[in-house]
Amino acid sequence: PEYTIIYFNARGRCEAMRMLMADQGAQWKEEVVTSDDWQKGDLKKAAVYGQLPGFKDGDFTLYQSNAMLRLLARNHDLYGKNPREASLIDMVNDGVEDLRLKYLKMIYQNYENGKDDYVKALPTNLGHFERLLASNNEGKGFVVGAHISFADYNLVDLLHNHLVLAPDCLSGFPLLCAYVKRISSRPKLEAYLSSDAHKKRPINGNGKQQ
């Protein structure tokens, strides 16, 4: 396979990429980094910003997970049909990143004391995505346009994580609830999500996810 993910044993910031590649029928390798590997320092020095994940497309190496998603989107025609759609996809993905950062801050820095307040704020944060869905084909398809985009994979991955954290979090959002089920039931993606490669990989590196 031409693609390689360089990352710790976690879904983390790579699961949206894995979902995209699986759904698109792409093959990839995993270079799993242990904490001992990371502590040695060589991988950290090689990384542009001193952090993982890293990604290889043949002999081309890239860092920053959203840049990796965009590379895959360009490679697999998942970036809209025109510049306006591409800009809307970027806008949605930036919103996903905003919520992911809030989620990760709670998971890694304030899980015990911050989880309840985080879950209470979810209706506001998830409401943005419900309205975005409603504005495109009455919420019956994808978040932008008539075809799946990299932002769909990123959003569905983050929603999967939230359904583990707070299983009822989508109960007030019928469009998002149907959307997650619809995207997750695409045949190749469903096969991946049912596999041990997905199910046995922890969501977060510190084991805190519910």
UniProtKB/Swiss-Prot annotation:
Keywords recorded for this protein, A-Z: Cytoplasm, Mitochondrion, Nucleus, Transferase
GO molecular function: glutathione transferase activity
UniProt catalytic activity: RX + glutathione = an S-substituted glutathione + a halide anion + H(+)
GST N-terminal domain location: 1-80
EC number: 2.5.1.18
Chain ranges of the GST C-terminal domain: 82-203
Residues annotated to bind glutathione: Y7, R13, W38, K44, Q51, L52, Q64, S65
This protein's record includes keyword Coiled coil: no
Locations listed in the record: Cytoplasm; Mitochondrion; Nucleus
GO biological process: glutathione metabolic process
GO cellular component, one term: mitochondrion
Keyword flag Transferase: yes
Gene3D superfamilies associated with the record: 1.20.1050.10, Glutaredoxin (3.40.30.10)
CDD domains in the record: GST_C_Pi, GST_N_Pi
Pfam name, any one: GST_N
Matches recorded under PROSITE patterns: GST_CTER (PS50405), GST_NTER (PS50404)
Family: Belongs to the GST superfamily. Pi family.
Function: Conjugation of reduced glutathione to a wide number of exogenous and endogenous hydrophobic electrophiles.
Assembly description: Homodimer.
PANTHER family: GLUTATHIONE S-TRANSFERASE (PTHR11571:SF141)
Protein's name according to its UniProt entry: Glutathione S-transferase P 1
Organism: Bufo bufo
